[in-house]
Amino acid sequence: MVERKASVERNTLETQVKCSINLDGSGKARFDIGVPFLEHMLDQIARHGLIDLDIECKGDLHIDDHHTVEDVGITLGQAFAQAIGDKKGIFRYGHAYVPLDEALSRVVIDFSGRPGLQMHVPYTRATVGGFDVDLFQEFFQGFVNHALVTLHIDNLRGHNTHHQIETVFKAFGRALRMAVTQDERMAGQMPSTKGCL
């Protein structure tokens, strides 16, 4: 099987991001981003997606977390697009429901080649540990725009904002894992009647 790995660097006047991924990993993760809550959530993607992730970012955190969070999402999306290749033989679609105590979230993804995000998370607080939770919309928008995926995120219930977010990221990791898995019966075939994605 061809290795499905990618390393991407993205440099702007606001951030310098390096991202390496292995879609067929074991969930190993290393982060040096400077935003602890974001790193905690990225760890959920790696662990539950069985994707090896290594991300470094030097960003303008003296202003706020916005550029760093968005640009990490963009760079991760670019890395996914590169690692997934021509998409032949993958399941393409992935979905997961994940609970954490009172919280329950659903994530559905399609490696369609068409970027689109529907994110419905009724946060009960504006911040968690000083982190502006609205920035996760920017993270996922950056990801879908550059991974070229359609992504539906719904927090179905929950009143602890940390739990709401953590269930979203765990479900995202598990949906990714399902979608990028190689289907032996589809070996060498494009998972689309169009013949391309």
Curated annotation (Swiss-Prot):
Gene3D superfamilies: Imidazole glycerol phosphate dehydratase, domain 1. It catalyses: D-erythro-1-(imidazol-4-yl)glycerol 3-phosphate = 3-(imidazol-4-yl)-2-oxopropyl phosphate + H2O. Its main location: cytoplasm. GO terms for cellular component: cytoplasm. GO terms for biological process: L-histidine biosynthetic process. Keywords: Amino-acid biosynthesis, Cytoplasm, Histidine biosynthesis, Lyase. It is an enzyme of class 4 (lyase). The keyword Lyase applies. Its EC number is 4.2.1.19. It comes from the Bacteria. Pfam families: IGPD. Pathway: Amino-acid biosynthesis; L-histidine biosynthesis; L-histidine from 5-phospho-alpha-D-ribose 1-diphosphate: step 6/9. GO terms for molecular function: imidazoleglycerol-phosphate dehydratase activity. The keyword Metal-binding does not apply. It is found in: Cytoplasm. Belongs to the imidazoleglycerol-phosphate dehydratase family. This is Imidazoleglycerol-phosphate dehydratase. It comes from Pseudomonas putida (strain W619). The gene is hisB.
